Amino acid sequence: MFWYNYYGDDMRRYIILVFICFSFYFCFKVKIDDFFQKNFFYNYIKYEGNDYYLDNDFNYFKENNSLIAYNKEDILNILYTFINKGCENFSFYCGSNYKDCRHDIDELMNDKSSILYINDFVHPYNSFHNISAKIDKNKITFKIFKNYSYSEINELNYIIKKIINENINVSMSVREKIKVLHNYLIFNTEYDNDYANDIKNSIPNDKNSYKATGALVNHLAVCSGYTDALSIMLNYLKIKNIKISNDNHVWNLIYVDNVWLHTDVTNDDLGSDVNNRYFLVNTDTIKFDGKHNFSENVYSEFQR
């Protein structure tokens, strides 16, 4: 016991200090873990938005740059934030108190309807056709499979720049610019009935009619192709817009003169004639036909 007699008081103080430190850690472990994940880890990984990031904020999806989720709403908002920034791979953590995190991730991945709504609120170039999740303890890593390749984006940007330079001038009002783009799509795009029938009957079809590539390159498209094409051109002109979708259809919602108005180019395309029935109309008007119903929860700020 020589060492104890020699170091007596110092050793006792050391043991007490170690005991206090361990007690403090286990008592406040959750807060400490979250602190280091949120501050230390976040300081070393920054996700910058790409050229197609949209600086918007909505009722259903809100930007959340945190790397820690505490509930399912946090997960959806983090997903929206990093998909909107164009990220193809990103990770975040479940908070130490979030016991249902793995269950909620599995639930979202098994029924992707909530996640797919994100596509309506981001630039079409940042939209995706599939998403995967890898769970490693409390770390969640997502991989995004985008709708548009880099070569498609370059080709579309070249075409869109040409369309706008040849058809839009600075003297036009916002409504006039939208009308020009609306009419351009009608005159230069044909609805692809063959593709629509194949999809309806679960027949594989590798054409691009569901994308802007179909509308602007191949001049054959279904509703999602018309809608993406108009959305991309509106974003090029810095005109705020999103998409609205239900199980059977998708169309554009455009912010004009401080009001959100609907435009459905697909149903305005009657072949050789231009129809304006669904051009910049309010919600009551577009819902009257019974074909344009949508989730009032997801699109809550656009009901009137």
Model feature map: region roles:
Residues 149-215:
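Secondary-structure boundary elements
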Residues 224-288:
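Hydrophobic/aromatic-rich core segments of domains that either
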Residues 8-14:
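Positively charged n-region of N-terminal signal peptides that target proteins for export
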Residues 156, 177, 222, 226, ...:
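Hydrophobic (often cysteine-bearing) scaffold residues that line and stabilize catalytic clefts
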Residues 14-30:
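Sec-dependent N-terminal signal peptides of Gram-positive bacterial secreted proteins and lipoproteins
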Residues 29-143:
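Intrinsically disordered, low-complexity N-terminal segments that are enriched in acidic
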Residues 82, 274-304:
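Alpha-helical and coiled-coil interaction segments, frequently adjacent to or embedded
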